[in-house]
Amino acid sequence: MGIKRQQSIQLVGMTEAHWADVSRIYAQGISTGLATFESEVPSRENFFESKIPELSLAALTPEGTVAGWAAATAVSHRPAYQGVVEHSVYVDQEYAGCGVGTRLLAELIALASRHGYWMVQSSIIADNDASRILHGRAGFREVGRRERIARATQGESAGQWLDTYLYELRL
């Protein structure tokens, strides 16, 4: 079933028309306490303002539902860092383990390279094994651990200090 699902997924540029599903999937990630330190889904306006349009993707099912999404933001507005982006990949729980995240990340990397970016990075909560494995398989390297960087607000770790790992891929 996973292979069939993966093959039937179409990657497209994310637009505001995808927001209902994107925000639903984002909320799933928030509730786990492992995907982000956000405590609530941002407004549609704030979400899209912060993302680089050419590095924003939605994975669509044949029915047009979003099965996952990936997006990148600028790390800094300083000219020296103009080629460095930080990204996120979120997959609907129903599609976890079906290759959706792998396809989204591979396409985001290809787009970043095509658009002249030279570094893609991600800060991953230490207990998010699935994301760490995904990034390792995609060629990212772990470059550092930030200990007790933030206190979890959601999930089983709520109230606890958590570590993150910084992963990067030079294009």
Model features per residue range: what roles?
Residues 32, 38-94, 105-106, 168-171:
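Acetyl-CoA-dependent GNAT
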Residues 97-112, 133-137:
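Conserved acetyl-CoA-binding loop-helix of GNAT-fold acetyltransferases
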Residues 112-124:
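Conserved GNAT acetyl-CoA-binding A-motif
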Residues 71, 79, 121-125, 136, ...:
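Conserved catalytic-core motifs of GNAT/GCN5-like acyltransferases
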